[in-house]
């Protein structure tokens, strides 16, 4: 019973950490990642479709991405979607592929993006604390319903706190690593 609560809590907290790392992949660091385009949708025959599902996206170097659509008639639509996404770059359409040349980031831009990373980390910590609160409430309900003793309840809450501390530590490490990657010149 308590083990199920621990397992569920650990699983939900791991998912929060994974979601944070997924969100981090959309932030730009010193080297441009293809993941920066993950949120862009292209109108594919009337259906909003992820950019990486209508063509291949690859990194040519630290500041250049290339998109090769599987259907050449999508070039204009992809170009329009990128412009509307407002990611700070103008698409360069050569009739075969679209190249995105990202300018080097200024120190000010790096600091702003690092600040965004920190805010994402704080959001993840709030999610983890909410998961802890839910788990503690389940334990307190078991105690109230006389299914576990007060001592078992206290031990269970301590165990939940340990799981929470581990998740918060992972979040802090992820934030620090991302900030370092962003601020690295």
UniProtKB/Swiss-Prot annotation:
InterPro entries reported for this sequence: Ribosome_recyc_fac (IPR002661), Ribosome_recyc_fac_dom (IPR023584), RRF_sf (IPR036191)
Keywords: Cytoplasm, Protein biosynthesis
Protein's GO biological process: cytoplasmic translational termination
Keyword Cytoplasm: yes
Region (Disordered) residue spans: 138-158
GO cellular component: cytosol
Gene Ontology molecular function, alphabetical: ribosomal large subunit binding
Keyword Metal-binding: no
Domain of life per record: Bacteria
Subcellular localization: Cytoplasm
Summary of the function given for this chain in its UniProt record: Responsible for the release of ribosomes from messenger RNA at the termination of protein biosynthesis. May increase the efficiency of translation by recycling ribosomes from one round of translation to another.
NCBIfam families documented for this protein: frr
Entry similarity comment: Belongs to the RRF family.
Entry protein name: Ribosome-recycling factor
């Amino acid at each position: 019973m308590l083990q199920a609560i621990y397992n569920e809590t650990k699983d939900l907290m791991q998912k929060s950490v994974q979601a944070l790392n997924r969100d981090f992949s959309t932030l730009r660091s010193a080297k441009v990642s293809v993941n920066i385009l993950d949120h862009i949708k292209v109108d594919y025959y009337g259906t909003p479709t992820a950019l990486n599902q209508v063509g291949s996206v690859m990194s040519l170097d630290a500041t250049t991405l290339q998109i090769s659509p599987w259907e050449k008639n999508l070039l204009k639509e992809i170009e329009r979607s990128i412009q509307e996404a407002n990611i700070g770059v103008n698409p360069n359409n050569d009739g075969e592929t679209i190249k995105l040349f990202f300018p080097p980031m200024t120190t000010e831009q790096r600091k702003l993006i690092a600040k965004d990373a920190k805010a994402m980390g704080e959001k993840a910590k709030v999610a983890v604390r909410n998961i802890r609160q839910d788990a503690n409430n389940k334990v307190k309900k078991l105690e109230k319903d006389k299914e576990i003793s007060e001592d078992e309840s206290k031990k269970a809450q301590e165990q939940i706190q340990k799981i929470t501390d581990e998740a918060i530590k992972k979040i802090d490490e992820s934030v620090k690593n991302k900030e370092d990657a962003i601020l690295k010149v």
